[in-house]
Amino acid sequence: MEDRKRQTRFITDLSCTFGATPDAPRSGKITSLSSTGCFVKTKAMVTKKQPLYLRIWMPENRWLRLCGAVNYNMEGVGFSLGFTANGDEERADLDRLLEELRGQQTAVAT
């Protein structure tokens, strides 16, 4: 089994949209977030390994656009998304968001 680096994740309630195309037509809530992925609460169906576009509504009232692939799906609950090839600007925005969350709450090791 591949050894995975442990990441700090934060419990959140961030609005998001997602989908197979960049316009990301489906909506959900991000309930946990780390530098490597998130969990999206939604009733929408996705499949394991499905590539998705994700848009997170940032505190400064703009979208953070990320790409990822579904790790697993819990039918009627939501799915885990692992972030994939994202640009330097998107990674920097995600890091800033995580730092803001770090200041607001206690992190949970995963």
Predicted features by range, described:
Residues 6, 44-48, 81-99:
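Short solvent-exposed strand/turn elements
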Residues 1, 54-55:
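Short boundary/loop segments of OB/S1/cold-shock single-stranded nucleic-acid-binding domains
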Residues 12-53, 78-80:
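Short strand-loop-strand
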Residues 42, 56, 68, 82-85:
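Residue-level recognition of conserved beta-strand positions in structured domain cores
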Residues 27-29, 66-71:
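Short beta-strand-centered aromatic/proline hotspots
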Residues 1-33, 95-110:
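N-terminal helix initiation/capping motif
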Residues 20, 32, 70-72, 85:
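A residue-level detector for short acidic-glycine micro-motifs
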